[in-house]
A protein has these predicted regions:
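Residues that define the loop-to-transmembrane-helix transition and helix capping
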Residues: 19, 89, 158-159, 264
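Transmembrane helix segments
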Residues: 158-256
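Helix-loop-helix units of permease transmembrane domains in multi-pass membrane transporters
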Residues: 68-98
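Residue-level recognition of pore/gate-forming positions within transmembrane alpha-helices
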Residues: 25-29, 98-99, 166-170, 222, ...
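Hydrophobic alpha-helical transmembrane segments
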Residues: 1-71, 112, 204-208, 213, ...
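Secretory targeting signals
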Residues: 29-36, 40-56, 98-165, 173-181
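Helix-loop interface residues and adjacent transmembrane-helix termini in multi-pass membrane transporters
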Residues: 13, 85, 154-155, 260
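Alpha-helical transmembrane segments of polytopic membrane proteins
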Residues: 51-54, 133-140, 186-196, 214-218, ...
Length: 290
């Protein structure tokens, strides 16, 4: 795993991609830091700088993660990885930790900015809150990296991986607004749950290579949804609202930096990270045995 980790870090900075992405995020942070924190004397680094750079992450992470596995498939070097004695989990973690190190570089500079505010008179409580916000920001980034790595494992085209990653993060970014639109009634929840059931059934059928299993999965999901709609429609609405809330990747960070320190928010980002790393391992395991 360590050899893969070193190889991935080296590849990020062998060309310009690592330097360009790091500079991109640093410039964005520096602009808000100088204009708001220093210009107006605002000690809240989490809200005025980190939160304002969230939109930049929609471009940063897809470009950072697009080549992690897509390039390996395109150059056929993934066959060497999959036939090596290294466990699939070790391959995934090696690449994941390498990308996390790349993302940590601008975060280290952000930490220096927080210390600068402290040196200029920010209180100890404000400084601790800023470091807590930076920790949450980093865990958010780790979750986004895990999502991007998973999407990269599904294709051999880096552009497709980047576009899919940007679309997924944009959807998560807009999800709070979409949640307000789609939780207006049980009929809307039923329709969207049915669409989700169709997607899951297609995935189940493709992974098992069984059309019958896909059809049975869809029929079972539709039957369960119909029963819920007729007998407990409120459960359907509440359940769909909970699903949409879980897809709001950036909303918990917004609440966190608004002086709402929350351990569940940190646990949420760790859970998303582990979940998508697990999905990536399963995808590579399937290809290894095929």
């Amino acid at each position: 795993m360590f050899a893969i980790f070193k190889r991935e870090v080296r590849s990020c900075f062998h060309g310009m991609i690592g330097y360009v992405l790091t500079a991109f995020l640093l410039v964005a942070s520096a602009i808000y830091f100088v204009a708001l924190n220093l210009g107006y004397g605002l000690p809240d680094f989490g809200y005025y700088t980190l939160y304002n750079t969230i939109f930049m992450l929609l471009f940063y992470f897809p470009v950072l993660t697009m080549r992690s596995f897509a390039e390996e498939r395109h150059t056929r070097t993934d066959q060497l990885l999959l036939t090596s004695p290294v466990p699939v989990a070790g391959i995934v973690l090696g690449k994941f930790f390498a990308l996390c190190v790349v993302f940590a570089l601008p975060c280290v500079v952000d930490a220096v900015m927080i210390l600068t505010l402290w040196a200029l008179g920010a209180t100890a409580a404000s400084t601790l809150a800023n470091f807590a916000a930076l920790l949450c920001y980093y865990l958010l980034g780790c979750a986004a990296i895990a999502i991007g790595v998973f999407l990269s494992s599904l294709t051999e085209n880096q552009i497709i991986a980047a576009v899919a990653g940007a679309a997924a993060l944009l959807l998560a970014y807009l999800m709070p607004s979409l949640r307000r639109m789609f939780t207006t009634g049980s009929a809307v929840a039923l329709a969207l749950f049915t669409a989700l059931a169709a997607v899951l059934s297609v995935v189940a059928g493709l992974r098992s290579r069984s059309f019958t299993l896909g059809c049975l999965t869809f029929a079972g999901c539709c039957a369960a949804l119909t029963v819920l709609f007729l007998l407990r429609s409120s459960w359907l609405t509440e359940g769909f609202s909970a699903v949409l809330s879980a897809l709001c990747l950036f909303a918990p960070f917004e609440e966190f930096v608004n002086n709402n320190f929350s351990i569940p928010t940190l646990v949420y980002y760790l859970t998303v990270t582990v979940l998508f790393l697990f999905f990536t391992v399963q995808e590579l395991e399937k290809r290894r045995w095929n």
